[in-house]
């Protein structure tokens, strides 16, 4: 079993929103590894960061991604930092991976002031700019396609991503 599509991208790129729209369009399930982690641990990611730290969260994330890649037949959205792990990048080889690319102004508008996003709690705009610069090469390395999300609706993006998927 393998996902029909794996979505990667920075916070605010639309992975969850576009992923849900894409899954609905294709008539398949939608899965988000961030939501999987929250369900497993029983608390929001922001609390995991506060209580156990980022390193612990990344360990949970690697496990969640590995499980999801092996058990999901629909659309899978990964957390924004999942591609930082070499283990995850290697696991994505052979999958259809779409990078939802977002520029800073749209990302800032979409994520707001970082509510519920632990890495954006302090100076969200500067942090988001740094995250975009740091992670963009990793997204590009794993992606089989890139879709620019700026100024477009989730439904428009779902149609574009669907057109990129193998038949």
From Swiss-Prot:
Top enzyme class, one word, equals transferase
The cross-references to CDD domains, in alphabetical order and at most eight, read: SK
> What reaction(s) does this enzyme catalyze?
shikimate + ATP = 3-phosphoshikimate + ADP + H(+)
Q: Which SUPFAM superfamilies match?
A: P-loop containing nucleoside triphosphate hydrolases
Q: Which coarse location class describes where this protein primarily resides?
A: cytoplasm
In the UniProt record, what gene is named as encoding this protein? aroK
Q: Which GO terms describe its biological process?
A: amino acid biosynthetic process; aromatic amino acid family biosynthetic process; chorismate biosynthetic process
Q: What is this protein called?
A: Shikimate kinase
Any one GO molecular-function label of the UniProt entry: magnesium ion binding
- Cofactor note as given: Binds 1 Mg(2+) ion per subunit.
Per UniProt, substrate binds at: 34, 58, 80, 135
Q: Which locations, inside or outside the cell, does it occupy?
A: Cytoplasm
Give the matching InterPro entries.
Answer: P-loop_NTPase, Shikimate/glucono_kinase, Shikimate_kinase/TSH1, Shikimate_kinase_CS
Q: Which residues bind ATP?
A: 12-17, 117, 152
The free-text function statement in the UniProt record for this protein reads:
Catalyzes the specific phosphorylation of the 3-hydroxyl group of shikimic acid using ATP as a cosubstrate.
């Amino acid at each position: 079993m393998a996902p029909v599509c794996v979505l990667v991208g920075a916070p605010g790129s639309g992975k969850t929103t576009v992923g849900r729209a894409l899954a609905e369009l294709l008539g398949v399930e939608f899965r988000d590894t961030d939501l999987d982690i929250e369900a497993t641990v029983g608390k929001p990611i922001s609390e995991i960061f506060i209580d156990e730290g980022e390193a612990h969260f990344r360990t949970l994330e690697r496990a969640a991604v590995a499980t999801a890649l092996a058990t999901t037949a629909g659309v899978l959205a990964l957390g924004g930092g999942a591609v930082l792990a070499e283990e995850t990048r290697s696991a994505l080889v052979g999958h259809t991976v779409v990078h939802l690319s977002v520029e800073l102004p749209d990302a800032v508008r979409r994520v707001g002031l970082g509510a519920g996003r632990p890495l954006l709690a302090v100076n969200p705009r500067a942090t988001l700019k740094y995250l975009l610069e740091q992670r963009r090469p990793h997204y590009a390395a794993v992606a089989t396609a890139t879709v620019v999300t700026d100024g477009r609706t989730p439904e428009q993006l779902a149609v574009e991503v669907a057109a990129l998927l193998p038949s």
